[in-house]
């Protein structure tokens, strides 16, 4: 029996402690509820803290959970963030069992909150699954921490002159919608270097590298007063891999293919014509497809200049063959005229012979019956005396020339234009590429962001 007494005392003590804890918990919750009720009693959430007196300072910082995608055609970007705001409301000071009260989003609607909006935002979404994603904490000195999870779709002006070697500074601008700077000012909670956090795993983009971010603040004037605007610039550098594979390499290969025609015989007109027309059509297709991923801007980009020069080289190769063919035909006609001029006088056949044949057949003595045809200038001796008279009476007529076939000089071989083109075209294209890539790769193409503090 004595052995059971310690166990009984232990059980009684544990039950007593649990009862005390339950009483303390109930007292704590009742105390907090009473504190909140007292704070909200007579509280007007239509008035900002310090209304009619001091300026309300709202400290902000941003944590980016996901950055992207970035659209060049629409000139916009999307990101998910935790947007944090901190301010002090003297009306919410309290003394109680805890220094910080962690409350849910229902408390937000009962107190004053800043009317922050995103000036360059096209569409912003506050997440509500499974409940509104909002964090609310109240410190004993009246300081409030208010955090929201947002998806922001914001405008990003882009100057695409250096595309695709370009960089952009995409801004995110926010401030008060109704309160001028005489009533509300915004500041960076952790300073300009650490107030915006972008983890490396949150910025994996397909076409860009997020190389950093900068913050600034500025004051703008409008008809309703001066407002403080906070700005975050996200610096993006474009990746060139896609465009090297899809645009630049095919253009270079097409130009090289067009220059292969310089090594084809100039007599092969169909082959060289097919080369020229095919490469021109290929360049046209490439130039059209390259524009699909770009907005319809009114100026030429760096890629447009490259495609235009490649198109000029391809078209020049086709014009070069036209020139070769023209001068080849011109040379052939000239050689034909020279051959006709240099031809020797033809061997003549006298018409006297033809007349003589007829006379001899008619007037010859029937005794001899001369039927042999005379086909040369030298006549055989005819025993008839009348034949001699016929010869003496036959007039000598001018001869008719017999033109022998012309022997034209060969026009084959390599044209001098082709010989020069085999050297000039590759050298010129290589020089253009050298200058083009040196200029754009060594150029600072990142857009400059304004950093007015």
Swiss-Prot record:
Localization annotation: Postsynaptic cell membrane; Cell membrane
Residue positions binding 4-aminobutanoate: 84, 147
InterPro entries: GABAA/Glycine_rcpt (IPR006028), GABAAa_rcpt (IPR001390), GABBAa6_rcpt (IPR005436), Gabra-1-6_TM (IPR047024), Neur_chan_lig-bd (IPR006202), Neur_chan_lig-bd_sf (IPR036734), Neur_channel (IPR006201), Neuro-gated_channel_TM_sf (IPR036719)
Residue(s) carrying Phosphothreonine: 403
Organism, as annotated: Rattus norvegicus
Any one Gene Ontology BP term: gamma-aminobutyric acid signaling pathway
Signal sequence interval, chain numbering: 1-19
A GO MF label: GABA-A receptor activity
Assembly notes: Heteropentamer, formed by a combination of alpha (GABRA1-6), beta (GABRB1-3), gamma (GABRG1-3), delta (GABRD), epsilon (GABRE), rho (GABRR1-3), pi (GABRP) and theta (GABRQ) chains, each subunit exhibiting distinct physiological and pharmacological properties. Binds UBQLN1.
UniProt KW keywords: Cell membrane, Chloride, Chloride channel, Disulfide bond, Glycoprotein, Ion channel, Ion transport, Ligand-gated ion channel, Membrane, Phosphoprotein, Postsynaptic cell membrane, Receptor, Signal, Synapse, Transmembrane, Transmembrane helix, Transport
Cytoplasmic side: 265-270, 326-422
UniProt modified residues of type Phosphoserine: 375
Protein name: Gamma-aminobutyric acid receptor subunit alpha-6
Function: Alpha subunit of the heteropentameric ligand-gated chloride channel gated by gamma-aminobutyric acid (GABA), a major inhibitory neurotransmitter in the brain. GABA-gated chloride channels, also named GABA(A) receptors (GABAAR), consist of five subunits arranged around a central pore and contain GABA active binding site(s) located at the alpha and beta subunit interface(s). When activated by GABA, GABAARs selectively allow the flow of chloride anions across the cell membrane down their electrochemical gradient. Alpha-6/GABRA6 subunits are found at both synaptic and extrasynaptic sites.
Record remark on domains: GABAARs subunits share a common topological structure: a peptide sequence made up of a long extracellular N-terminal, four transmembrane domains, intracellular or cytoplasmic domain located between the third and the fourth transmembrane domains.
Glycosylation site positions: 31, 128, 141
Disulphide bond pairs: 156-170
Catalysed reactions, semicolon-separated: chloride(in) = chloride(out)
Transmembrane segments: 244-264, 271-290, 305-325, 423-443
């Amino acid at each position: 029996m004595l052995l059971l007494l310690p166990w009984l005392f232990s059980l009684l003590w544990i039950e007593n402690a649990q009862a005390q804890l339950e009483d303390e918990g109930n007292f704590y919750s009742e105390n907090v509820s009473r504190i909140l009720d007292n704070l909200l009693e007579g509280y007007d959430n239509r008035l900002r803290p310090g209304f009619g007196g001091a300026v309300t300072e709202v400290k902000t910082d941003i944590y980016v959970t996901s950055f992207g995608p970035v659209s060049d055609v629409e000139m916009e970007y999307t990101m998910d963030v935790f947007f944090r705001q901190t301010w002090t409301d003297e009306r919410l000071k309290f003394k109680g069992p805890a220094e910080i009260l962690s409350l849910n989003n229902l408390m937000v609607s009962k107190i004053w909150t800043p009317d922050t909006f995103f000036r360059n935002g096209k569409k912003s979404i506050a997440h509500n699954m499974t409940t509104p994603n909002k964090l609310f904490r109240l410190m004993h000195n009246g300081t409030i921490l208010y955090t929201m999870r947002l998806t922001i779709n914001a405008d990003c002006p882009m100057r695409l002159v250096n595309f695709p070697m370009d960089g952009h500074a995409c801004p995110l601008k926010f401030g008060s919608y109704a309160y001028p700077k005489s009533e509300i000012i915004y500041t960076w909670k952790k300073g300009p270097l650490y107030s915006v956090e972008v983890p490396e795993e949150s910025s994996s983009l397909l076409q860009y590298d997020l190389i950093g971010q900068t913050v600034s603040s500025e004051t703008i004037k409008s008809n309703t007063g001066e407002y403080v605007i906070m700005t975050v610039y996200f610096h993006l550098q474009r990746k060139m891999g896609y465009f090297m594979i899809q645009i630049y390499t095919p253009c270079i290969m097409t130009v090289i293919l067009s220059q292969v025609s310089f090594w084809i015989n100039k007599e092969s007109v169909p082959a060289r014509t097919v080369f020229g027309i095919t490469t021109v059509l290929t360049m046209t297709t490439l130039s059209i497809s390259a524009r699909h991923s770009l907005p319809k801007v009114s100026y030429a980009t760096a890629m447009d200049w490259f495609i235009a020069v490649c198109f000029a080289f391809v078209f020049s190769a086709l014009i070069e063959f036209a020139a070769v063919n023209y001068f080849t035909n011109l040379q052939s006609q000239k050689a034909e005229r020279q051959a006709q001029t240099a031809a020797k006088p033809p061997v003549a056949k006298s018409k006297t012979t033809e007349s003589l044949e007829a006379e001899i057949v008619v007037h010859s003595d029937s005794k001899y019956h001369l039927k042999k045809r005379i086909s040369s200038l030298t006549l055989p001796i005819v025993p008839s005396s009348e034949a001699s008279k016929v010869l003496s009476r036959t007039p000598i007529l001018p001869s008719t020339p017999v033109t022998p076939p012309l022997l034209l000089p060969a026009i084959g071989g390599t044209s001098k234009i082709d010989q020069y083109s085999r050297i000039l075209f590759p050298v010129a294209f290589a020089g253009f590429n050298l200058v083009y890539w040196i200029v754009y790769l060594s150029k600072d193409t990142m857009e400059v962001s304004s950093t007015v503090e």
